[in-house]
C-alpha cells in the first residue's frame, strides 16, 4: 500500500477507500425520496407502482448477477483497473436517469449503474482484505460502515431536498464519483499478486475453502439485503399512508436509520475486542427485528422514527461482520470471488425486497410487510444463537 513509515499516504489511501465505498451506498437509495413524484409522472404506465420500485432495485439485480464475475476479474487481472472503470461508468449511468423521459430507458441506465457498482463494491472489499488484517481490519471495517452511512445521511437528505425541486434532480448527485476518481488514480496502487498482508497466498499449498461457513454468511447477508432495502423503497410510501407525503421528510426518515447505523458502526472495532462475530450477529439481527416490529406498529411519526433508529443501530452492529468473516475464511487467490459472492447475496436481497414487501403490502398492508421483515430478522438471530450453543465456546477472531 505504502511505506509503513510514511503515514500521510496511508491516511490518504484509507480516506480514498472510505469515499469510494460510499458510492455503493448511494447507488440505489439516493433517488428514493423522488419515487412518489416519479410514479406520478409516469402514472400512465401500467404497473408503475412496481416499476417505480425497480428504479432502486434494478441496480441491485445487476450487482447480484455480475459481482461474482467482477470477483473473478479481480482475482485474474487485478484490482485497480476495474475500480477506475467502475467509477467512470458509475458517474455516466447514474446521471443518465435524469436524461430520459422513458421508464424503460431509465431502467436500462440503472442496469449499467448496477454493473458499475458491482465492480466498485467488490474491488473495495477485496482491497480492504489486501491492505489490512486482524484488529486494524476490524477497526477499518467499522469506520467504513460508519463512513458509508454518514455519507448516506448526507446523500439522502440532499436527495430529499433536491427532489422537492424536480424528481430528476437527485440523479445528478451521482456525478460526485468524478470528484473521487482523481484520489483513486493518485493513491490506490495494485497490491502485489503474491503477497497479501491480510490474507493467505497459500505458499504453494492447496487451501480448502470452507464453503459451508461461507454459505451461512451469504444467507445472513441476503436477509440483511431484503430487510435493509425495505427502508428506502417503502418508508416514503409508509409516511404517505400516515399523512406525511413530503419527499424531504422521506429523505430525513431514511437518513435517520442510516445515521443510527453510522453512529453504532463507529464503535464496532472497540466492541469487537470483547465480543465475537456470532454474538454481534445475534444482537444486531435481534435489535433490527425489534426496530421493524416498532415500525409495523407505528401509527404516528415518533414510533416510526424510533423503529428506524433501532433498525439502524442493529445494522451498524451487523454489516461489517459479513466482510470480516469472509476475509478470514477466503484464501488470497479466491478473495475477489468470495467477496463478489457476498456482494451478490446482499444485492439479490435488495432486488427481492420490493417484490416481497410490495406483494405483502398489496394483499394486506405495509405494516404487515414490516412485521414480516421483523420475523425474518428474528429467525436469523435465533439461527446464529442456536449455532453458538452447538459450537461453544464461540471462536473470537
Question: Model-derived features: where do they sit?
Answer:
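Helix-to-loop junctions at the C-terminal end of transmembrane segments
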Residues: 66-78, 264-276, 361
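Helix-breaking motifs and short loop linkers at transmembrane-helix boundaries and internal kinks
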Residues: 78, 99-104, 133, 297-299
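Extracellular/periplasmic helix-loop-helix junction of adjacent transmembrane segments
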Residues: 35-64
Amino acid at each position: 500500500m505504502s511505506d509503513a513509515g510514511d503515514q500521510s499516504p496511508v491516511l490518504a489511501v484509507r480516506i480514498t477507500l472510505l469515499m469510494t465505498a460510499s458510492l455503493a451506498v448511494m447507488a440505489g437509495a439516493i433517488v428514493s425520496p423522488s419515487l412518489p413524484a416519479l410514479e406520478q409522472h409516469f402514472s400512465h404506465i401500467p404497473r408503475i407502482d412496481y416499476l417505480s420500485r425497480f428504479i432502486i432495485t434494478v441496480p441491485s439485480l445487476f450487482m447480484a448477477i455480475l459481482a461474482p464475475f467482477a470477483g473473478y476479474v479481480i482475482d485474474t487481472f487485478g484490482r485497480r483497473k476495474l475500480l477506475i472503470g467502475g467509477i467512470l461508468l458509475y458517474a455516466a449511468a447514474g446521471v443518465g436517469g435524469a436524461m430520459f423521459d422513458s421508464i424503460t430507458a431509465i431502467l436500462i441506465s440503472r442496469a449499467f449503474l448496477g454493473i458499475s457498482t458491482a465492480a466498485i463494491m467488490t474491488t473495495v472489499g477485496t482491497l480492504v482484505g489486501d491492505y489490512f488484517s486482524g484488529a486494524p481490519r476490524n477497526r477499518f471495517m467499522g469506520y467504513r460502515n460508519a463512513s458509508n452511512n454518514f455519507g448516506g445521511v448526507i446523500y439522502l437528505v440532499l436527495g430529499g431536498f433536491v427532489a422537492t425541486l424536480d424528481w430528476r434532480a437527485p440523479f445528478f448527485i451521482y456525478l460526485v464519483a468524478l470528484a473521487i476518481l482523481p484520489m483513486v488514480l493518485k493513491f490506490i496502487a495494485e497490491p502485489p499478486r503474491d503477497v497479501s498482508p491480510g490474507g493467505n497466498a497459500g505458499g504453494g499449498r492447496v487451501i480448502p475453502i470452507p464453503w459451508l461457513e461461507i454459505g451461512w454468511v451469504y444467507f445472513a447477508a441476503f436477509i440483511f439485503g431484503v430487510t435493509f432495502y425495505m427502508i428506502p423503497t417503502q418508508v416514503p410510501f409508509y409516511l404517505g399512508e400516515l399523512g406525511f407525503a413530503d419527499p424531504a421528510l422521506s429523505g430525513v426518515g431514511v437518513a435517520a436509520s442510516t445515521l443510527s447505523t453510522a453512529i453504532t458502526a463507529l464503535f464496532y472495532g472497540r466492541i469487537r475486542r470483547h465480543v465475537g462475530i456470532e454474538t454481534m450477529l445475534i444482537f444486531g439481527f435481534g435489535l433490527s427485528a425489534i426496530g421493524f416490529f416498532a415500525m409495523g406498529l407505528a401509527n404516528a411519526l415518533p414510533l416510526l422514527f424510533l423503529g428506524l433508529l433501532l433498525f439502524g443501530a442493529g445494522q451498524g452492529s451487523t454489516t461489517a461482520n459479513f466482510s470480516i468473516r469472509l476475509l478470514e475464511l477466503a484464501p488470497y487467490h479466491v478473495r475477489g470471488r468470495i467477496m463478489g459472492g457476498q456482494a451478490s447475496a446482499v444485492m439479490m436481497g435488495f432486488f427481492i425486497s420490493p417484490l416481497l414487501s410490495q406483494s405483502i403490502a398489496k394483499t394486506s398492508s405495509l405494516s404487515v410487510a414490516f412485521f414480516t421483515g421483523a420475523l425474518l430478522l428474528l429467525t436469523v438471530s435465533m439461527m446464529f444463537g442456536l449455532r453458538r450453543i452447538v459450537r461453544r465456546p464461540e471462536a473470537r477472531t
